[in-house]
UniProtKB/Swiss-Prot annotation:
Gene (UniProt): rplP
Gene Ontology MF term list: rRNA binding; structural constituent of ribosome; tRNA binding
Alphabetic keyword roster: Ribonucleoprotein, Ribosomal protein, RNA-binding, rRNA-binding, tRNA-binding
Pfam families: Ribosomal_L16
Name of the featured protein: Large ribosomal subunit protein uL16
GO cellular component assignments: cytosolic large ribosomal subunit
Length: 145
Protein backbone atom coordinates (compact mmCIF):
# COMPACT_ATOMS: atom_id res chain seq x y z
CA UNK A 1 0.00 0.00 0.00
CA UNK A 2 1.02 3.59 -0.55
CA UNK A 3 2.44 5.60 2.33
CA UNK A 4 5.34 8.01 2.77
CA UNK A 5 8.73 6.50 3.60
CA UNK A 6 9.55 9.19 6.13
CA UNK A 7 7.71 12.27 7.36
CA UNK A 8 9.01 15.34 9.14
CA UNK A 9 6.10 15.25 11.61
CA UNK A 10 4.22 12.09 12.59
CA UNK A 11 0.91 13.88 13.11
CA UNK A 12 -0.61 16.82 11.22
CA UNK A 13 -2.77 19.60 12.60
CA UNK A 14 -6.33 20.00 11.44
CA UNK A 15 -7.02 22.68 8.84
CA UNK A 16 -8.89 25.45 10.69
CA UNK A 17 -8.87 28.13 7.98
CA UNK A 18 -11.37 28.71 5.21
CA UNK A 19 -10.85 26.97 1.89
CA UNK A 20 -9.37 29.45 -0.57
CA UNK A 21 -10.22 27.43 -3.67
CA UNK A 22 -13.39 25.43 -3.97
CA UNK A 23 -11.98 23.49 -6.91
CA UNK A 24 -8.55 22.00 -7.51
CA UNK A 25 -6.00 24.18 -9.26
CA UNK A 26 -3.19 21.67 -9.72
CA UNK A 27 -3.55 18.14 -11.05
CA UNK A 28 -6.66 18.83 -13.13
CA UNK A 29 -5.36 17.87 -16.59
CA UNK A 30 -4.28 14.53 -17.99
CA UNK A 31 -0.48 14.38 -18.03
CA UNK A 32 0.47 10.80 -18.86
CA UNK A 33 -2.40 8.79 -20.38
CA UNK A 34 -5.19 9.47 -22.86
CA UNK A 35 -8.04 8.66 -20.44
CA UNK A 36 -8.60 9.51 -16.81
CA UNK A 37 -10.85 9.41 -13.77
CA UNK A 38 -11.60 12.91 -12.44
CA UNK A 39 -13.12 13.67 -9.04
CA UNK A 40 -16.42 15.57 -8.90
CA UNK A 41 -16.50 16.11 -5.14
CA UNK A 42 -14.23 16.82 -2.20
CA UNK A 43 -13.07 14.06 0.11
CA UNK A 44 -10.27 11.81 1.24
CA UNK A 45 -9.11 8.58 -0.37
CA UNK A 46 -7.08 6.22 1.79
CA UNK A 47 -4.29 3.97 0.57
CA UNK A 48 -6.41 0.80 0.72
CA UNK A 49 -9.09 2.30 -1.52
CA UNK A 50 -6.47 3.47 -4.03
CA UNK A 51 -4.86 0.02 -4.08
CA UNK A 52 -8.22 -1.75 -4.52
CA UNK A 53 -9.10 0.53 -7.44
CA UNK A 54 -5.65 0.07 -9.02
CA UNK A 55 -5.95 -3.74 -8.81
CA UNK A 56 -9.45 -3.65 -10.35
CA UNK A 57 -8.25 -1.46 -13.24
CA UNK A 58 -5.15 -3.57 -13.90
CA UNK A 59 -7.12 -6.83 -13.81
CA UNK A 60 -9.43 -5.60 -16.54
CA UNK A 61 -6.69 -4.08 -18.72
CA UNK A 62 -4.32 -7.06 -18.29
CA UNK A 63 -1.36 -6.05 -20.48
CA UNK A 64 -3.20 -3.75 -22.89
CA UNK A 65 -2.49 -0.48 -21.10
CA UNK A 66 -0.61 1.35 -18.38
CA UNK A 67 -2.08 2.90 -15.23
CA UNK A 68 -0.84 6.01 -13.41
CA UNK A 69 -1.98 7.00 -9.91
CA UNK A 70 -2.05 10.80 -9.72
CA UNK A 71 -2.76 11.27 -5.99
CA UNK A 72 -0.58 10.12 -3.10
CA UNK A 73 -1.77 9.41 0.47
CA UNK A 74 0.61 11.53 2.54
CA UNK A 75 -1.71 12.90 5.24
CA UNK A 76 -1.74 10.79 8.44
CA UNK A 77 -5.04 10.09 10.21
CA UNK A 78 -4.87 9.40 13.94
CA UNK A 79 -7.14 7.38 16.20
CA UNK A 80 -7.36 6.91 19.96
CA UNK A 81 -8.38 3.50 21.36
CA UNK A 82 -12.04 2.87 22.23
CA UNK A 83 -13.21 3.61 25.79
CA UNK A 84 -10.33 6.00 26.48
CA UNK A 85 -10.97 8.92 28.84
CA UNK A 86 -10.72 12.51 27.69
CA UNK A 87 -7.33 14.18 27.62
CA UNK A 88 -4.12 12.17 27.27
CA UNK A 89 -3.29 13.81 23.94
CA UNK A 90 -3.84 12.96 20.32
CA UNK A 91 -3.98 9.33 19.17
CA UNK A 92 -1.44 7.38 17.17
CA UNK A 93 -1.35 7.57 13.34
CA UNK A 94 -3.57 4.79 11.98
CA UNK A 95 -3.43 5.21 8.20
CA UNK A 96 -2.67 7.74 5.46
CA UNK A 97 -5.14 9.54 3.19
CA UNK A 98 -4.90 11.62 0.02
CA UNK A 99 -7.01 14.80 0.15
CA UNK A 100 -8.93 15.17 -3.14
CA UNK A 101 -10.71 18.28 -4.41
CA UNK A 102 -13.26 18.50 -7.23
CA UNK A 103 -11.37 18.47 -10.53
CA UNK A 104 -8.41 16.37 -9.38
CA UNK A 105 -7.41 13.54 -11.72
CA UNK A 106 -7.08 10.38 -9.60
CA UNK A 107 -6.14 7.74 -12.20
CA UNK A 108 -4.89 7.86 -15.79
CA UNK A 109 -4.89 5.05 -18.34
CA UNK A 110 -2.90 4.96 -21.58
CA UNK A 111 -0.16 3.07 -23.32
CA UNK A 112 -2.13 1.18 -25.93
CA UNK A 113 -5.53 0.90 -24.24
CA UNK A 114 -8.49 1.80 -26.47
CA UNK A 115 -11.32 4.01 -25.20
CA UNK A 116 -13.82 1.20 -24.70
CA UNK A 117 -11.53 -0.89 -22.50
CA UNK A 118 -10.23 2.18 -20.62
CA UNK A 119 -13.81 3.32 -19.91
CA UNK A 120 -14.78 -0.11 -18.56
CA UNK A 121 -11.58 -0.46 -16.49
CA UNK A 122 -12.04 2.97 -14.89
CA UNK A 123 -15.73 2.20 -14.27
CA UNK A 124 -14.68 -0.88 -12.28
CA UNK A 125 -12.08 1.18 -10.41
CA UNK A 126 -14.43 4.03 -9.53
CA UNK A 127 -16.69 1.68 -7.58
CA UNK A 128 -13.82 1.19 -5.10
CA UNK A 129 -13.56 4.93 -4.38
CA UNK A 130 -15.71 6.93 -1.91
CA UNK A 131 -16.12 9.89 -4.31
CA UNK A 132 -18.22 10.72 -7.34
CA UNK A 133 -16.02 10.67 -10.42
CA UNK A 134 -16.27 11.04 -14.18
CA UNK A 135 -14.42 9.61 -17.18
CA UNK A 136 -12.33 12.16 -19.11
CA UNK A 137 -10.49 12.00 -22.45
CA UNK A 138 -7.37 14.01 -23.28
CA UNK A 139 -8.34 16.80 -25.72
CA UNK A 140 -6.62 16.52 -29.09
CA UNK A 141 -5.61 12.89 -28.58
CA UNK A 142 -6.13 10.15 -31.14
CA UNK A 143 -8.96 8.91 -28.89
CA UNK A 144 -11.10 11.98 -29.67
CA UNK A 145 -10.84 11.63 -33.46
Amino acid sequence: MLEPKDTKHRKVQRNQGLKRNKYAVKGTRLSFGDYGLKSLEEGEVNSRQLEAARVAINRYLKRDGKVWIRVFPDKPKTKTPAETRMGKGKGEPEHFVAPVQPGNVIFEVGGGADEESAREALRLGKHKLPLKTKFVVRPGSRAEE
